[in-house]
């Protein structure tokens, strides 16, 4: 029911965020949601404008680029979520203060362990593991070896898990991957996605220096779809699968797609 359903949000571009404001907002949202917030953050994606974060008052430190600025904002945000006091109290406050240094309020206990980092490379997946963030790996990543997308993504997940173990965190990490999956069970499915499954991974440039590999769309009759998904190494390596849906096709059609996956695909693969 609604009481146990997670409230996932992803991904927030940290280049544009004030970590202190964001810690307040995230804490409030998690408390309102009863501790169900699963918050995805990242360094952001290619944009419509040049250096849009500058208009929000942010700039990288000397020698840093905007990606490093986004990661710095994330590190500050994570530190604030620990709820450890850092600000000196006013000796003559308007309202009585608790003893010691003050933290940001509202503080949501446990939210720190429900932050996910959207990693586009193996290096940032390792960095996220060291900081104790869960891993969110999408339908694209940096093309680091020239291998198939799912193989590179599975390697990224292994790299992340190894870094997590090395960091000595007490809890087990969460790992999600995203996929576009369409069981072809109706004429409409065939009309929309009948040819999509024949295309493989795509290669493209997401900025001047970054060659990326984009994962294929899975679209086939249910039996074939199950066989194809069984061979996806990254799905096997993750504990959570996020489904990307074509929002522009409307609520009813997307509900049909999800229902078809739950009925025709998930049981055969042991998904729940």
Sequence positions of predicted segments:
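Short, small-residue-biased leader/transition segments that mark boundaries at the very start
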Residues: 1-7
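Conserved strand-turn element in the central/C-terminal portion of the radical SAM core barrel
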Residues: 8-15, 177-183
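Active-site mouth loops of central-metabolism enzymes
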Residues: 10-20, 109-119, 212-223
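Flexible, glycine-rich active-site loops centered on histidine and acidic residues
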Residues: 14-86, 135, 141-143
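Short, acidic/polar
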Residues: 25, 120-126, 222-232
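C-terminal amphipathic alpha-helical "assembly" element
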Residues: 38, 137-154, 158-272
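Extended catalytic-interface subdomain
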Residues: 65-109, 114-116
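A conserved active-site cap/scaffold subdomain adjacent to cofactor or substrate pockets
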Residues: 123-144
